[in-house]
Amino acid sequence: MPGVDFQQLREQIAIEEVLRLLGCEAVSRNSDQWRGPCPVHRSASADSRVFSVNLKTNRYYCHKCRSHGNQLELWAETQQLSLYDAAIDLCQKLGKEVPRSHRW
C-alpha cells in the first residue's frame, strides 16, 4: 500500500481550510495571525484568544493546553486520528486527491 506524501499535502491544504471545517471563528485576526478559542481543549469562552494560528506558516499553538503543530496535526488531534488516517479523512472532506508516496 502506498504511503501519503505528507509534505505535498501540507503544501496543498492551508490551515485556514482546516479551521473552517472545524467551525472555528476568529476573535481577532490580522493578515497573518488568527486568534480564537482552542478546538483541541474546547475553550469554554467563545471570546477566548488562547489559540493562535500563523496563517503564513500553517502552524498553531494553544497558550493554555500547549497543543501545537501544523494543519494535518490539528485535524488529527481534533478528530482523534493517526496522522495517516487524518490525511486521508481531510482529503475526503475537502474533495482533494491524496498525494501518494511510493518510497519505502
Task: List PLM regions with ranges.
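N-terminal structured subdomain of primase-like DNA metabolism proteins
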Residues: 1-104
